[in-house]
Swiss-Prot record:
Stretches the record annotates as Disordered: 231-267, 306-338, 650-735, 1045-1066, 1181-1216, 1322-1394, 1440-1504, 1540-1597, 1610-1642
ZnF RING-type: positions: 24-65
Keyword Glycosyltransferase part of the UniProt annotation: no
Catalytic activity: S-ubiquitinyl-[E2 ubiquitin-conjugating enzyme]-L-cysteine + [acceptor protein]-L-lysine = [E2 ubiquitin-conjugating enzyme]-L-cysteine + N(6)-ubiquitinyl-[acceptor protein]-L-lysine
EC code(s) of this entry: 2.3.2.27
Pfam name, any one: BRCT_assoc
Biased composition (Polar residues): 705-716, 1373-1394, 1445-1470, 1610-1624
Location of Phosphoserine modifications: 114, 395, 398, 423, 434, 551, 694, 708, 725, 753, 840, 988, 1009, 1143, 1189, 1191, 1211, 1217-1218, 1280, 1328, 1336, 1342, 1387, 1423, 1457, 1524, 1542
Keywords per UniProt: Acetylation, Activator, Cell cycle, Chromosome, Cytoplasm, DNA damage, DNA recombination, DNA repair, DNA-binding, Fatty acid biosynthesis, Fatty acid metabolism, Isopeptide bond, Lipid biosynthesis, Lipid metabolism, Metal-binding, Nucleus, Phosphoprotein, Repeat, Transcription, Transcription regulation, Transferase, Tumor suppressor, Ubl conjugation, Ubl conjugation pathway, Zinc, Zinc-finger
UniProt xrefs under InterPro entries: BRCA1, BRCA1-associated, BRCA1_serine_dom, BRCT_dom, BRCT_dom_sf, Znf_C3HC4_RING-type, Znf_RING, Znf_RING/FYVE/PHD
UniProt free text on domains: The BRCT domains recognize and bind phosphorylated pSXXF motif on proteins. The interaction with the phosphorylated pSXXF motif of ABRAXAS1, recruits BRCA1 at DNA damage sites.
UniProt domain BRCT: residue ranges: 1642-1736, 1756-1855
Protein's name in the database: Breast cancer type 1 susceptibility protein homolog
Amino acid sequence: MDLSAVRVEEVQNVINAMQKILECPICLELIKEPVSTKCDHIFCKFCMLKLLNQKKGPSQCPLCKNDITKRSLQESTRFSQLVEELLKIICAFQLDTGLQYANSYNFAKKENNSPEHLKDEVSIIQSMGYRNRAKRLLQSEPENPSLQETSPSVQLSNLGTVRTLRTKQRIQPQKKSVYIELGSDSSEDTVNKATYCSVGDQELLQITPQGTSDEISLDSAKKAACEFSETDVTNTEHHQPSNNDLNTTEKRATERHPEKYQGSSVSNLHVEPCGTNTHASSLQHENSSLLLTKDRMNVEKAEFCNKSKQPGLARSQHNRWAGSKETCNDRQTPSTEKKVDLNADPLCERKEWNKQKLPCSENPRDTEDVPWITLNSSIQKVNEWFSRSDELLGSDDSHDGRSESNAKVADVLDVLNEVDEYSGSSEKIDLLASDPHEALICKSERVHSKSVESNIEDKIFGKTYRRKASLPNLSHVTENLIIGAFVTEPQIIQERPLTNKLKRKRRATSGLHPEDFIKKADLAVQKTPEMINQGTNQMEQNGQVMNITNSGHENKTKGDSIQNEKNPNPIESLEKESAFKTKAEPISSSISNMELELNIHNSKAPKKNRLRRKSSTRHIHALELVVSRNLSPPNCTELQIDSCSSSEEIKKKKYNQMPVRHSRNLQLMEDKEPATGAKKSNKPNEQTSKRHDSDTFPELKLTNAPGSFTNCSNTSELKEFVNPSLPREEKEEKLGTVKVSNNAKDPKDLMLSGERVLQTERSVESSSISLVPGTDYGTQESISLLEVSTLGKAKTEPNKCVSQCAAFENPKELIHGCFKDTRNDTEGFKYPLGHEVNHSQETSIEMEESELDTQYLQNTFKVSKRQSFALFSNPGNPEEECATFSAHSRSLKKQSPKVTFECEQKEENQGKNESNIKPVQTANITAGFPVVCQKDKPVDYAKCSIKGGSRFCLSSQFRGNETGLITPNKHGLSQNPYHIPPLFPIKSFVKTKCKKNLLEENSEEHSMSPEREMGNENIPSTVSIISRNNIRENVFKEASSSNINEVGSSTNEVGSSINEVGSSDENIQAELGRSRGPKLNAMLRLGVLQPEVYKQSFPGSNGKHPEIKKQEYEEVLQTVNTDFSPCLISDNLEQPMRSSHASQVCSETPNDLLDDGEIKEDTSFAENDIKESSAVFSKSVQRGELSRSPSPFTHTHLAQGYRRGAKKLESSEENLSSEDEELPCFQHLLFGKVSNIPSQSTRHSTVATECLSKNTEENLLSLKNSLNDYSNQVILVKASQEHHLSEETKCSASLFSSQCSELEDLTANTNTQDRFFIGSSKQMRHQSESQGVGLSDKELVSDDEERGTDLEENNQEEQGVDSNLGEAASGYESETSVSEDCSGLSSQSDILTTQQRDTMQDNLIKLQQEMAELEAVLEQHGSQPSNSYPSIISDSSALEDLRNPEQSTSEKAVLTSQKSSEYPISQNPEGLSADKFEVSADSSTNKNKEPGVERSSPSKCPSLDDRWYMHSCSGSLQNGNYPSQEELIKVVDVEKQQLEESGPHDLTEPSYLPRQDLEGTPYLESGISLFSDDPESDASEDRAPESAHVGSIPSSTSALKVPQLKVAESAQSPAAAQTTNTAGYNAMEESVSREKPELTASTERVNKRMSMVVSGLTPEEFMLVYKFARKHHITLTNLITEETTHVVMKTDAEFVCERTLKYFLGIAGGKWVVSYFWVTQSIKERKMLNEHDFEVRGDVVNGRNHQGPKRARESQDRKIFRGLEICCYGPFTNMPTDQLEWIVQLCGASVVKELSSFTLGTGVHPIVVVQPDAWTEDNGFHAIGQMCEAPVVTREWVLDSVALYQCQELDTYLIPQIPHSHY
């Protein structure tokens, strides 16, 4: 001890005295929630309420007998602060001395038991479906230990069954060991076990009534149920909700049968309280409690370590537990304090429970219950222990630590071995493994207890960094103490202390939920099985996530131990102890089992925690951020420390870099966040850190675990879980259950899953879907899929970081598998499926997975956003996540260049040589580490960065595997860096990310097909499954997953994936999370559906699995299945799938549109982003529908992905003819030619294709994309233009570079251009947001862009151009940062940037001229364009023409139109057909290389080429780079010819015309607005014509496109473009008006520059209006001006509003005073609705239906105050005098400043307006009449007259004037 015994005693006496003073006279415990009576006596609130409730009459104060009533009770906050501080002091003292105060903690424990248990019970009821079972089991447990065994196993669903038996067996023989783990080191425990048991049991019996029996049995359980406790935890969780009494009973029974019951009953009880309390706290205020609990757990952990070190410490720990219990009791009043104690308790309990089970992990929740019970028994036992073994304190500790650790390890190993024996026992293994892990952690902590004490103290005081500093010491101490026995343990200990500190910090930072999250992380880190077990419970609380993070870092540091990251760590330490040599492999097996079990547990836990998670998801997200940050830096430290001794020094070094970054990980998260500019970045960053930690280690983990995990096969279980979970919380449950199943199925996946499950759990909390789908598919292709799915899960959880982690895990695993041949990659990935197939395959899967991770992240963000209206309850967080994702992505992108390149190298190397990959990865990791995640997530990072990096890595890897693709691979590598450039601005970053994802995915698609050839079919199928899972998990992820699926299975999938990724990315950007929720929901469905799709793509590789999945998912998503059936059919035949998809889309389109609308409605305005997210799924608005009925939408999306993938994989040209594959054709062309660069375009193109086939879905996605990715699209468009340039120039490479720089230039140059282009696009986007048009528009834009680019690229030089385009796209994406990470492209970009700037300026002039010509052409063909205008909207082909900048905008418009006009619906057959036909035609034309098309030489197909010409023209117009004048003229001519020549070409022609319009008319703004106004009506009107007259639709589309091109031009030369836009718009308007008055009206409305102000809106609503205004190019101002046209008021459903200044000014000025519902409904319907229907009808003062605003607007020629002279006299409140004067002026009155200035006798009526209540002098205003001969009225006369817009009679408002004599 540091302090002398005397000093310690003195301090203890003082503290005891303070405690007595702060004790409640009734319960004799530290006062909890102190309340003071009138007589100034302080009692516990609970005690007083109990006292007051006992007597009917007036109660008396127990001390002074005065009457007291409930009303007289007052909360004593100062006293509660005293108690809180005292508890902190006690905790600190305990940490310093290892002593515990049984008194206070016993009290706390006791008191907390009842309230906390009750709360927990409620929570558990919500969170766990097994609660009743658990209760029954627990009830029967006291009667029979065997029953207990059975019940835990039942509760755990076989997780605990085997384990329970083993645990019991072990526990009974090794009861002392287990208990020793709890109380002290094994030796000490063994020595004192008997005493403890007897004394403890006796004490427990004594305390039993108070729930101490639970604790006692817990202690005994700790002894006997170390492994058992995990099983029991579930029981306890279930049981606890029932009552503390049950626990007490069980504990009493346990006491009676100390060995038997303590083993089982105690464990159950203890566990149950953990789960229950934890859940309760998570759900209820216990969130705060939990935070405290976590903190306390941390403290306890440290203390427990101390206790482990010293018997005295152990005793102290028990005392502290008692204190913790007391604190828990206090928790209700000082939640933080309780939490602190609870955290300490959880720590202690964790140590005990680590030995027991998940106690610690669950302790955060559990501690609240168990800590008190456990604390009491612990305290008493510790006290006895102290009395018995004070002398043992010093010397026995280290021995005991080691001995116990060894014993524990042996137990754990036994358990693990036993578990390994059974696949069904894997759960038990997980439990046991987690147990050992916890035990190890506990032991480590014990070993470290002294060193940790200060650290913990710091934690207690919230000094994380100090703790961090201490951690290394702890680590060293731990290593010294248990270096031989536990190599992993120190890490765990470090992790725990770090986690503890982090938890504490989190608690301080974020409050309950953050703390919960911290705890989640901590628990997750601590052990996967346990963490997952708890994670289901605690992940909601952040604790698990935190643990995960810690574990990840620790594991990384640990090397081999790292592989046992969560579960692996404990297992590893166990194995290290037992078989240090066989550590890696056995550990991996054990870990695999543990993780499997953990996953299973997790799946179960999610059921329990689902509600909790849902409720605390958002909070958890916030916490997550904190956790990750806090956790990350400490983890880094840990990593560094542990790394030194880690067997994986290389990894460690990488991580050391990462630790710096990791320690910066919090910073990194923050940095990334700032860089990204996304708030959510933090969480992703944290998750990234986690991912990094996990990822580095996960590889090890995965590598080690795969073989062992292979034995676990729970596919059917998985499926079962998945199917049930889908209905339940499709995402969450599936996540948990599927994940478990997946884990069971594949060792590696299990490992990953275990790691990710925790993360995913967190993620699941944010977007539950993510994990589930991944897991689900993991079952089929367990390893790869699970990894991907786990990745997805992790990704979902961190959404970005997790994605990285997952991505990195896969790549790293693969690489590390190769890297450290100790666990061969084959061994490491001993998946029954893909990983074993090929390391390169694995790598590609890894890459794909990382891509999936990124997509998952993006999807998760979208899902989260969508969650708001969808299944999940994290709409806000998802949004943040979305932002975070982009931020993270951006950060990743920044880092990504390196990482991506590394990844590609790695992947390539892996594909070519696994051994090579090892060094490459090491190098890459090292190089990438500066990027924090680079090593961890080179793939994921790249993927995250743009999905291009990782995707590219994948594709490059595939290419590396395949000679044909190697060049693109190399291209991809350099492109990866290009993708990295997307570091540039956040917006660009997101866009870049999207594009990169597209490029990457295209590239991936490209490479995937080779991958398949290479025998990656399994992996692809795994990827496919994963991607399905991912899709299900996240829409964005779905794209990625689709991509992966495509890679593995079919290009279609990749295409869809890319499409979705692009959309998703864009959506994420646009929505940054809102769409995520819906998208995730859709994704879930999609994921469900995707198995079938997966199957399709899987047929060759894993047909059976897909079938199984298919069956499974068909059940879950029959609709989707139905939709998916075609996909499945076209699995092998991706083309057929696309066709079916097209037909599906055709049939689905109306539904989709409707669904989109529904989704939007569901999304509502608050969830506008979600709506946009829905738009992401817009192909069939089934997206939202998917959330509900995944099948159609999922299928659509999947089909979309597959279709696209099919195009990609299948020879693009072959697929070109297919209607459904029109876009895929483009995509394929792009992909085929330039799999890397076209990837972006292709992705967009695929998006376009998908949009065409599932236009609504894609429209939604596009809408979102257009919102967030509009700039991306613009960039894409620019890239496309660049591509056009390159195509036209036939200089794909150099031109591309030029284009790249030009793109950059355009980006920089066209920031305005982007603004306009984006603006128009945004307008459409906004409309899309308001109407869903924008998204589709954007999607269309990106689609067209991609398509056009793809066509051009494919025609020109598919690979070269495509690659160049990809580069350009990536460069473009990075826009300003093109040069940053463009490796080769970078310099080119820079050079070309200058050149392109000059060229662009020249081209801008040319474009303006050409636009004028185009305008003329448009005017000539005005009717056609206007006729086609809706067509344009719905004509993806036309959009394709606009594919370049113009295309992007027009694509958006087209998509919007498609959505609006139900392009997928009515035009889906034809629109889709037309689109596809056009694509087909384009493809065929491309192939045919019509001369007309050849005009934009890159394009080779007549119709498509014409459109492409339009593209090219628009591109040149927009970029100014291309020979725009001549080309445009040519295009115009071609368009004319085509329009005149052919209907199908008409489609193309219209696209030309629109292009002309775009070029000739800056009609984009108006076009978009027009488009948005008109798209639906237009589309609906033209729907039949569109389908019947494809040409007409394209015309409309082209008209739309033209404005967009114009917008692009505007972006380049804003003024000219705007002018042209106006002119073009007018021309378009004329044609439109001819054909569509409605369109014309909307056009006119758009034509008239709109300006709006808002009044009475919340910030969220204002942001929605802002987006709406941006979409429709409406000026949004804060103050009302003369230019203002609209005043948006917050109203109720009847359009009744409050009266505000802007309300009066709007009426007085004759503005549109409309309800906020106008904005929301417009966003929902993706078009600007007529304001008439939303005009404010009344206000709360003047009547609910006085129609004042309408009257004012319609009678501006009849001013109500005409002929009046009004003097606003005196002070006015709530309204400046000048504003009041302005109001009366606007109403026709002449304003007089002074009373003396009235003009008399001129026929003007003077009126004086005053506000009597504003006058300080009571009667001052009464004398005004003395100064002038004018009536004096109140201000209400003005306000009422204005509001009603009827001059009111003065009589009512006259102020009586008092004669002057009265004064």
